[in-house]
Curated annotation (Swiss-Prot):
Pfam family, one: Ribosomal_L31e
GO molecular function: structural constituent of ribosome
Signal peptide location: none
Gene name in the database record: rpl31e
Gene Ontology BP annotations: cytoplasmic translation
Protein's name according to its UniProt entry: Large ribosomal subunit protein eL31
GO cellular component: cytosolic large ribosomal subunit
Entry keywords, A to Z: Ribonucleoprotein, Ribosomal protein
Recorded superkingdom: Archaea
PROSITE patterns per UniProt: RIBOSOMAL_L31E (PS01144)
UniProt xrefs under InterPro entries: Ribosomal_eL31, Ribosomal_eL31_CS, Ribosomal_eL31_dom_sf
């Protein structure tokens, strides 16, 4: 069941799946792309806008050690006929 426009949902993104498949020095950049792809798939959104705080959390321990999972709050809105997902850190 897709998220209705205007709703907020908390997701736990499993970044560990990506960490195993890429070299150590590519982990944080690949984790950022994975978060974007994962949210787009689960929120059924064409565009995903990630808050800078989420990016800072991914890069907090450097490029080789992103977190294993990340709790995020996703708000979906409808703009010009497209679904847009806004991603923030969950409290």
């Amino acid at each position: 069941m897709p998220i209705k426009p205007g709703d907020e949902v908390i997701f736990t993104v499993p970044i560990r799946k990506v960490k195993k498949r890429v070299p150590r020095w590519k982990r944080a950049p690949r984790a950022a792309r994975f978060v974007r792809e994962w949210i787009a798939r689960h929120a059924k959104a064409e565009e995903v806008i990630i808050d800078p705080a989420v990016n800072e959390k991914l890069w907090e321990r450097g490029t080789e050690k992103p977190p294993n999972k990340l709790r995020v709050k996703v708000k979906v809105e409808e703009q010009d006929g497209k679904r847009v997902a806004y991603v923030n850190l969950a409290d």
